[in-house]
Amino acid sequence: MKRKLMLLLACLFVGIGLVTAQTQKVTGVVISEEDGQPVIGASVLVKGTQIGAITGVDGDFTLPNVPSSAKTLVISYIGMKTQEVSIRANMKVSMKPDTEVLDEVVVTGYGVQRKASFTGAAAVVGKDVLAKKTDANFVKALEGAVPGIQMNNSTSMPGIWGSIYVRGRGSLNSGTQPLYVIDGMPVDSDTDDNSLTYPTNNTIDPMSSLNPADIESITVLKDAAATAIYGSRAANGVIVVTTKKGAEGKFNINLDIKQGFVTTANNNMDFANAQQTMKLFTDGYTAAQGGDWQENYNYLADDYFGWDRKSSYDWMDAISRKGYYQDYNLNMQGRTGSTGYYVGLGYLNTEGLIIGSDLERFSGRLNLDTKFKWATLGVNSSYSYTTQNGFSLSTAGSMNSPLTAAVSSQTPMNPFYDSEGNYANINNYNPLALMDEKTGELNQSNTQMVNLNPYFQIDFGKGIYAKTTLGVNINELRQYQYWSALYNPQAQDYNGLGQQYNSKSTVVTWNNIIGWNYKFADKHDISLMLGQEMQKKSYFYEYYAKSDFPFAASGMRDLTTAGTDQGNEYYKQEARLASYFADVHYSYADKYYLSGSFRRDGSSVFGTDNRWGNFWSVGGKWRISGEEFLSENEIITNATLRASYGTVGNQDISWYAARGFYSSGYNYNQMPGMRPTSIPNPELTWEVSKKFDIGFDLSFLQRIHLTFDFYNEETSDALFEIPLSMTTGISKTYQNIGSIRNRGIEFSINTSIIQNNDLNWNFFANLTWNKNEVIKLSTDDPLEDTYQIIEQGHPYSQFYMKEYVGIDHETGKPLWYLNKEGDETTSDYNAAAKRYVGDADPKVLGGFGTNLTWKGVDFNLNFNYRLGGKVYNSGAAFTGFGMAFRTPLEDVALNSWTPENKNAKYPQYIYRDPNNATATSSRYLYSGNYLRISNVTLGYTLPKTWTQKAFIQKLRAYVSVDNLYTFTASDFVGYNPETSADGVIAWQYPATCTFIGGIQLTF
């Protein structure tokens, strides 16, 4: 018996030895190559088996029984590139971030969807793109990076913003701006109505209150499948902003320091010097008044201008400077146990190119979330305080703007100061006097923005969850404007005028959703969401003014020192929105996808007959590369076809547009009286946009990625503020008058040219072609203004004016087409016919660029471009082409017609312009084509073996240039071919170029 037992034990040990010889224990750690931090939750799988593990809190893993025959581990993690590595006993694996994988998740505001199952059209911009830009507004980072995005901003003044189109202008007269959603909450941008816009004609930019350093990603939602869930506010697209949250892993501190300067980008407005200007003025004065040329020259030089005949004064140079730029950001990010946190602090101070214009912003953000076994509780919050100094940028001009005064009220013969050192030409709007820090003009805006978004989510198990979110957005603005006693507005003897504008916008949103995610039979996935939302918007506004500032000469320009009231104004407004919505997604075998959404909105903005509107979408997608005939294809690695159709709405008009109002204060015979100020319209209803999109996504070799979209968007019941007859006593009223259509193509390519451990080289490009057309107009006549016309069958931004042909080389007179056919010409401006002479919107726009990394060196070069649009420069007609005695452009001074120079480029300059050479015509309509070097960045990251000794995880130094240069059409006259929405520019704030150097530190 004893011998049998010994034999049994011997066999057992031999068996164990054989098994041990056939398996092995593999341990290791997975870290991020980007910051050296552990990658928690990464999947580690033995290739070809079911043996695997998930990395722990230190990025560690253990595989106790790996077959000895196994050679490879497959390691994967969302946001990282999947790697296959050879098996060793103790392993350390560095995972690289996958920018392509970042696109695999689409944030829709109400939730997150896998891009593979997403049937809509969307584009994602990550934090790396934002980090390269210096603009206070994060939206500028989308220009050239996202197809379908058109920026309309003709100024580089800090803190001033224009507008943005997503797939063209979608409305005639109501809001054209996309809906902004920040961390799931709609935010009131309202750059069209009820905005933070005052008589300075500058739109104070509410989005510049959000620090780009706090943003994780921006998702642009375009078609109906992506936007219909937002119903009545989604006609112009949706921009979803996701801020940074607590990250897995240990505590990180990130510091980013940027400093630099702001200078002129490029200049297409070269003004003549004093000698050139005097010759042109004398030519023009002699042509108008007659007499001897030299005697006229002497009169103008000595008596009219008092010129010393040798000095030449550059007024644009006098009001310009090299502005200082500084941007500091500190954030702390991590997760302790079940609690994640992100704390961000930022300070931005940027001086504008023109003296007296600047922006200063303090910002803070706190995002917290705590995860329980069955629930998540969190809050996203931010605060910012912004101070902006500037002046009017109206296309109508304002002599109280130093920029306007410099180019339209001064000449190079006018000195800056008189013989006693005081400001010269004080009665002719000396811009230096306007900018005097002690006694000059003031235009300061202070904006406070508070966002508070607490949320609570319960997970019931089996894919069922419920979430409630409260959003509070408060935007408060105080703006003070002081008009110097030297330059009283409206020619009134005010002895100084101070105007205080205060407003407060509050938006409270509460939404509740319940969702269900379910998978059955291994091939069927379904997700369902039902939701309800309520929103209340309130707007408070007050204005008061005073004059008579007795101590203004000593620098006391505060309203409390003024003596005479000049009026006041006060009002409050409210608007409410109630909504119910549903969203469903289904997929089969991860190849066929269907989606649908429905939303019912009720808005207080519209008439009692049309308070409620229904909006919906359907979408489908086929992943062709998942079929058997392509599954083994190593060249075509992804091919998908998608399509969507649906309706969305637009309610961005004056909140009380459908109601009739009366104003008091109109007394008669000492009896109190009132008069109607608006006409009620109970039939006023939503604009409804029907959106169709078909798209194709294609990838080759997992390196070349192509996306193509065709879209057709038609807006009906377009809202427009119609002028009324003077006999009504009311100037305008809103009506639904027509339809507008945008049809276009989007194309993008992203390719990895070289990809290995040391060298990575990528290239991207995108292109958008869009055609805008007014397809229906219910008014009796087209709607015409000074420069443009809204007419059925033409683009919304159609220029309509007398068409300039050239000059009569025998007489020097300007010529225009006499008739609409364009087969006859005339030198009589009044006899010339108006013609369609171009469209303000570009036909094609987009961007392209490349980025390269080699070991620790990184290099980025980005461009954006426009082709086909027109720009009208009304300021050039008033100034640069010699109207009256205003400084001409150098080219005009040297190349205007004279009897001795009959082959000249420009018509004869004649004082007071009797030939209407500077009247409105296509003479001042220029090509808006341009190619801009939007960003160049060069950086170097020190090796971790150096920095870790100082407890620094990452140290990167870099230099960057924004808007390095803009190549324009040869005939363009202006500082910037990028215009406001109507394509008209005048007295532009010069385009700026920002040079910065920076350091990024991660501890």
Regions found by a protein language model. Name each.
Residues M1-R365, D369-K371, T376-N380, N451, ...:
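Short, small/polar-rich motifs associated with maturation and membrane association
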Residues A10, N331, D369, N762, ...:
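Conserved C-terminal beta-signal and adjacent last beta-strands/turns
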Residues T72, S117, Q150, K250-N254, ...:
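Membrane-spanning beta-strand positions in outer-membrane beta-barrel proteins
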Residues G148, P158, Y342, W854-S874:
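Glycine-rich phosphate/pyrophosphate-binding loops
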Residues Q150-S154, A228, S625-E632, T945-Q948:
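Active-site phosphate-binding and catalytic loops of NTP-dependent enzymes
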Residues T176-Q177, I182, D193, E248-S312, ...:
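Surface-exposed loop/interface segments of Gram-negative outer-membrane beta-barrel transport/assembly proteins
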Residues T243, L330-G334, G364-T370, L452-I458, ...:
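Residues on the lipid-exposed face of transmembrane beta-strands in outer-membrane beta-barrel proteins
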Residues T608-W612:
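Short glycine/threonine-rich loop-to-helix capping motif typified by GTGT followed
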